[in-house]
């Protein structure tokens, strides 16, 4: 890591990158446009994701606080770091 920033790692596969950022805050956007923000707790080979301190966001506004959430990998459009935390 350089200057404390998350290094996406050139040549790394996505599951290795996600394993490296376990414990960090992430944004998960689903194929149906729902957005979840939370702390990444685990990811498996199917890209299934477990989040803690999870919040559901709709149209840029926090809708619901779920606490813990499990997201099935085939529903995920993208995962990114949550720099707003």
From Swiss-Prot:
GO molecular function terms noted in the UniProt entry: RNA binding
Cellular component terms per the entry's GO annotation: nucleolus; P-body; sno(s)RNA-containing ribonucleoprotein complex; spliceosomal complex; U4/U6 x U5 tri-snRNP complex; U6 snRNP
GO biological process: maturation of SSU-rRNA; mRNA splicing, via spliceosome; tRNA processing
InterPro entries reported in the protein's UniProt record: Lsm6/sSmF, LSM_dom_sf, Sm, Sm_dom_euk/arc
SMART domains: Sm
Subcellular location: Cytoplasm; Nucleus
Presence of the UniProt keyword Ribonucleoprotein in the record: yes
UniProt keywords, alphabetically: Cytoplasm, mRNA processing, mRNA splicing, Nucleus, Ribonucleoprotein, RNA-binding, rRNA processing, Spliceosome, tRNA processing
Any Pfam family matching the protein: LSM
Domain Sm span(s) in chain numbering: 13-85
Domain of life: Eukaryota
Family of the protein in this entry: Belongs to the snRNP Sm proteins family. SmF/LSm6 subfamily.
Assembly with partners or alone: Component of the heptameric LSM1-LSM7 complex, which consists of lsm1, lsm2, lsm3, lsm4, lsm5, lsm6 and lsm7. Component of the heptameric LSM2-LSM8 complex, which consists of lsm2, lsm3, lsm4, lsm5, lsm6, lsm7 and lsm8. The LSm subunits form a seven-membered ring structure with a doughnut shape.
Protein name: U6 snRNA-associated Sm-like protein LSm6
């Amino acid at each position: 890591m350089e200057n404390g920033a998350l290094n996406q790692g050139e040549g790394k596969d996505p599951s290795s990158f996600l394993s490296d950022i376990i414990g960090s805050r992430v944004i998960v956007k689903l194929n149906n446009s729902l957005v979840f923000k939370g702390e990444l707790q685990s990811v498996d080979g199917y890209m299934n994701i477990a989040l803690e301190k999870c919040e559901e966001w709709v149209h840029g506004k926090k809708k619901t606080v779920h606490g813990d959430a499990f997201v099935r990998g085939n529903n995920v459009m993208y995962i990114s770091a949550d720099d707003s935390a």
